[in-house]
Each structure stands twice: as C-alpha cells, then as structure tokens.
C-alpha cells in the first residue's frame, strides 16, 4: 500500500502520455486545465527567453528580474488588487503568506478540506488553529463566538477544493468574517483563470471563484498557482501594497529561495491574454458536462454537483479497490490516479479525474467505456 512514483512522459501537443512504458495512454490526471502548456506561441516566447542568462539568485540579492515585475503587474490587474508577489510555487505562496500574517497571538479558522500547503502554513505559524467542518457556516459562526476575545483572526479556505471539486461557500464566509473583523484568505489555485466573470474587462476576466461568486472585493488575501489555468509554473499572492511589502521583508519562503526564472515569467505573461479570451473555458465546461453526465449514468458515485468543475472525483471508498481500479484503467489505456488517506479521509478513497479543454470527445467516450467495464468487474457498479 506504499505510494510509488509512476514514470510519466507527456506526449507533445496531445492529451496522451507514456506511463510506466505503456504508450498512448489518455491522460486524465493533468492540471493543465486549458491546455496552454502545449500552446505554440507560449512555447516560442519561452524558448527565446531561455537564450537569456538567468540571475540564479534570490530576489532580494540579484534575482529581481524586470519580467517578474511585469508579471506581478499583470496578475494584479487580473485579480483587481493593488499588488501581487510571485513565489516559486503555489505551495510556497501559501506557506509564505500564512506564516507572515499569523503568529501565536492569532487564531486561524481553516476548512477541514484545505490543501496541505494551507495546513502546513497554519502549523508553522504557531497560531491557535480552529478547524471547521467543510463548508459548514453554522460551525464557523460558533467557532468565531468561542474566540471572540482573540484580537487577530484569519479565516482561510480554498476557492475550488482540489480533491472534491466543489466550491467554497465564500459569500457566507466573507459575510461572517466581516462581522467578526477577521482577515479572509482564499487559495484559488484550481479556480483561477477557469471561473469568473466572462463579461468583466479583458484584464480581469476569469479571475477565479471570488469573482465568480461576486465577492472579489471582500477577499483580503488571494493565493494562486501559475501551473494550472495558465499551464506554466509558479505561484503568487495578491493583496494590498502593504501586505506585499510585509511579505518581502518577513516571508522566509520568499526571502530565502531563488527567484522564478525569466522564461517561466515570460510563459505566464504570454499565457494570461490567451487564457482570458474565454473560448477555452467553453470547451472545458462542455467536456465537464459530458463526462459528469455519462459517468453518473453508469451508476458511479461522484462527488460534487453536476458539471460543477473540471475536477471529478469518483468515490470508491476502499483504498485497495481504488488502487486496483486505477491499475485496471491503466491497462485499458486510461491514466487516472487513486487518491487515498492521508490526502483524503479514511474510507473516502477515490479516482480523481482532471479534465482539460484539449480532451476530445472520442477520448472521453473511451474513458467512460473503460470506467464502465472496470467498474462492473470490481462490482462498483
């Protein structure tokens, strides 16, 4: 039952991969939701930038490349915030901002299904941590009442939850946090550039779940990733200029690490206007609706609501059965990883499907057929 690293080589400009030597496998594990890692214009710009010499330094020494500043300005426009700060990864962005804003005199209220980077940031901060049941606003209010004597309070959640594919109850969280004079922090790595207002200005279109739910201005701290909606690499924090300056001077996860290389900044800068056009999101949600409907018709137990997001968890329950299901799918040319404890709760092992805008209908139909075949053999259906 120990985890094992599979050897995965993604095929060029396709949604297939070679997995442990098995070729032409349909890849349903990628977080490249809009398929931009294959975009030729982005790749050409990155290749040109690779000819430049990287500073190979932290930003406070010699690594503050002009392209990083350009990227941060574009991301601030995208999020409609005063400023942003780019980190090497989304994981480090969460650790950096939480450990900077919270200390032993702070209480953090955290959704029980928050990502490991949020959990780790909370623990490292030394704050008093109160965990509330997933999206349970009644319990969140009760916890706030119990900690009313604490001066500094932060409520942190994901926008789109990475293992369940459902959306945070951000409207209620923002209301409660405002009443309690608490900071609201949202990690929207999986919703950024996928969800949002399609009618917004070009720079802020698809700026994530907060925008989608109409509470963007009520969020104090946004964190996100450049490796999902943009298909690039890196992470960032979007907030006020004051918080940006605080992070530059206090965040160990920013100060003591090398800066994001120029070619990755150029890739993200090139990807932003492509990602915000809207045509790729339409293709993605067409695939989501089709996949969710067909899997439901098979009788599989799916988490989340119909067509709610690009993350579709097929709940198996038993860990060994989930691992065997994944193995048999791979034998059938379908790559879907089994996710189990401690990533998810015991007894809730699942197959986590990640859809992209590049998946063809024939590929999805083939995957659905394989789910049906394997599900019947394992008596899941």
Model-derived features: positions:
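Structural motif of enzymes handling amino- and sulfur-group chemistry
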Residues: 259-276, 287, 296
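N-terminal "arm"/small-domain region of PLP-dependent enzymes with the aminotransferase-like
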Residues: 1-53, 182
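Conserved N-terminal alpha-helix of the aminotransferase class I/II PLP-enzyme fold
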Residues: 44-89, 288
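PLP-dependent enzyme catalytic core of the Aspartate aminotransferase-like
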Residues: 40, 66, 77, 331-332, ...
